[in-house]
């Protein structure tokens, strides 16, 4: 078996995974994700080697789409594209947790600034607004009053990202 560990920043964890696999006699490669390229022409994209790929990219979208390309080429990837897509999207994750009756904060989704404002008026404060995609607390806003709601609405309306029109709010 040949294991390829794909990363975009070589951290302690990737080095340890590599070392432990080598110590167990597994042929292992560390592959930097940044210079990788793929093609829809399968014959052009087989330069990447491995029987199984452990996708360890910090960048959600880089890892997600590298996984998609590897699966297109019929490679086995841990974790699969569908798993990465769900886990990287708070709305999708929240829906699955709720459907599976796994306790989590009360969560609401709106799809316009106006409905976001109506929701905050109905629920009251404090609330928390989170981006659909992201980690490490980036883009998380505590909402304690209507002034904060108005500032967030203005910021989001100036942003060209389609995801900024979706408001993910938790009590």
Regions found by a protein language model. Give the residues of each.
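ATP-binding N-terminal substructure of ATP-dependent carboxylate-amine bond-forming enzymes
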Residues: 1-83
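Short catalytic-loop micro-motif centered on adjacent basic/acidic residues
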Residues: 4-5, 53-55, 79, 105-107, ...
């Amino acid at each position: 078996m040949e294991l390829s560990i794909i990363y975009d920043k070589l951290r302690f964890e990737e080095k340890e995974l590599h070392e432990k696999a080598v110590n167990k006699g597994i042929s292992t490669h560390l592959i930097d994700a940044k210079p990788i390229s793929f093609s829809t022409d399968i014959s052009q994209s087989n330069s990447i080697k491995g029987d199984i790929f452990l996708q360890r990219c910090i960048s959600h979208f880089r890892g997600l789409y590298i996984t998609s390309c590897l699966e297109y080429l019929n490679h086995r990837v841990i974790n699969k594209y569908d798993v990465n897509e769900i886990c990287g999207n708070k709305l999708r994750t929240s829906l699955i947790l709720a459907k599976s009756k796994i306790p989590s904060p009360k969560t609401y989704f709106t799809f316009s600034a106006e409905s976001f404002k109506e929701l905050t008026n109905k629920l009251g404060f404090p609330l928390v607004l989170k981006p659909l995609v992201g980690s490490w607390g980036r883009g998380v806003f505590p909402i304690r009053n209507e002034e904060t709601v108005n500032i967030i609405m203005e910021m989001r309306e100036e942003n060209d990202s389609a995801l900024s029109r979706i408001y993910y709010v938790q009590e």
